[in-house]
């Protein structure tokens, strides 16, 4: 639908928020359809850095509990009624918070080997945890093929 509107001269800004694999997908499609514009798309995707839960995105619930994002309600880093948000947010002595700030070093499997890690940021860690009970396991909702995630490396598998 977005492409159809764009082709009709009615460009729309589209925000996808629950699967950061959409970024590489859109870039790869743009590379085929409009290589010049694909460069701009890639720069924007790199600037955004994909999922930013625990870094650029956070959630303060109604009771003051601080979470990595709105989906991490089962894990609190502290309460703004007891400590300032800035203190809670920058406290990397809490293991999960520290790792979320530098999650590229902790993701496993195909996420760790993915050439798009700088673009998607490892996708949703909370979804990986919900399915595998491991925050750092690959996000099960990543629909990119092994070939697509290895394109920048010139390989064909990310096992």
Report residues per predicted region.
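Short C-terminal domain-edge/linker segments immediately following a structured domain
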Residues: 47, 88-91, 99-100, 142-147, ...
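Cysteine-cluster motifs in flexible loop/terminal segments that predominantly coordinate metals
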Residues: 105-154, 158
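C-terminal accessory region of radical SAM enzymes
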Residues: 1-40, 65-122
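Conserved short histidine dyad/triad with adjacent acidic residue
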Residues: 41-45
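Short, small/polar residue-rich loop motifs at catalytic or cofactor-binding pockets
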Residues: 51-55
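A structural motif corresponding to the C-terminal lobe/cap of the Radical SAM core domain
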Residues: 1-13, 34-36, 46-50, 133-151
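Short, acidic, Ser/Thr-enriched surface-loop or helix-capping motifs
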Residues: 60-61
């Amino acid at each position: 639908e977005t492409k159809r509107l764009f082709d009709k001269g009615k460009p729309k800004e589209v925000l996808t928020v629950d699967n950061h694999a959409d970024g590489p997908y859109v870039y790869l499609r743009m590379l085929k359809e409009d290589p010049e514009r694909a460069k701009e798309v890639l720069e924007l995707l790199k600037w955004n850095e994909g999922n930013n839960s625990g870094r650029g995105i956070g959630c303060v619930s109604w009771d003051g509990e601080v979470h990595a994002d709105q989906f991490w309600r089962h894990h609190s880093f502290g309460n703004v009624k007891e400590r300032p948000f800035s203190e809670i947010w920058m406290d990397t002595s809490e293991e999960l918070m520290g790792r979320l700030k530098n999650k590229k070093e902790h993701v496993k499997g195909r996420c760790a080997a993915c050439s798009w890690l700088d673009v998607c940021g490892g996708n949703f860690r909370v979804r990986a945890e919900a399915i595998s009970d491991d925050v750092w396991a690959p996000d099960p909702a990543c629909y990119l093929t092994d070939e697509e995630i290895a394109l920048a490396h010139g390989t064909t598998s990310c096992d």
